Amino acid sequence: MKKLKLTIALSLFATAVSVNLNAQDTNTDNHTITISIPEVALVDIEPSATKNITLGFTAPTEAGNPLTPSAANTTLWLNYSSIKSVADPTRNVTVKLNAIIPGIDIHVTAAPASGSGAGTLGTSAGLLTLSAADQTIISGIGSAYTGNGANNGHNLTYALAAGSGPGGVAVYSDLQATATTVATVTYTISDN
C-alpha cells in the first residue's frame, strides 16, 4: 500500500511539475499586425487660390503683322498622390479643354517633376495642343506623391498661338474679336 501511495504521489507531483513547465513563458513570442493601405488617386492644380489664369493677344501696330500672344504663363503646378493597386501597373494624368476657341491653339507643357515628392513619379508628354479629347500629359505614375503646393510636382506652361503654328491645328481665318472667352482645362488621374 505504501508503494501504491508513493507511486500515486510521485505521479501527481510529476504531472504538476509538467503542467507548470508548460505554462511558463518562453524566450520568444509573437503576434500579428493587420495593415490596411488604401488605393489613392488624387490630382490638383496649385496654387489653388490663383489657379485661374488670363492669357490674350496684343493687336499689331503695323499693318501686315499678326496678333502677338501674351507671354507664356508658368505659375501653375500639377500635384498628385497615387497608391496603385496590384492589378494596375501605372497611372496617367490626362488633360482636355471644354471649349475650343476658333482660331486659337492653347498649348500646355508639363515640366519634369521636381520638389519634395517621392516614389515612381510620372513622365511628361512634352508640349500638347489642348483639345476636347483627353490627352495624356503625364504617364507612368506608380505609387508616388509630388509634394503639395507651388514648386512641387510638374510646373505647367500655358501659351497661346493664333492660327496654325508648329504642332497647331487652329486656322488664323477663324479668329473672331471677343472681349473675353472662358475655357475650362480639366486634369484627370486614372489607371492605364
Where do the PLM segments sit?
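Bacterial N-terminal signal peptides
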Residues: A9-A16
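Sec/Tat signal peptide C-region and signal peptidase I cleavage site
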Residues: K5, V17-Q24
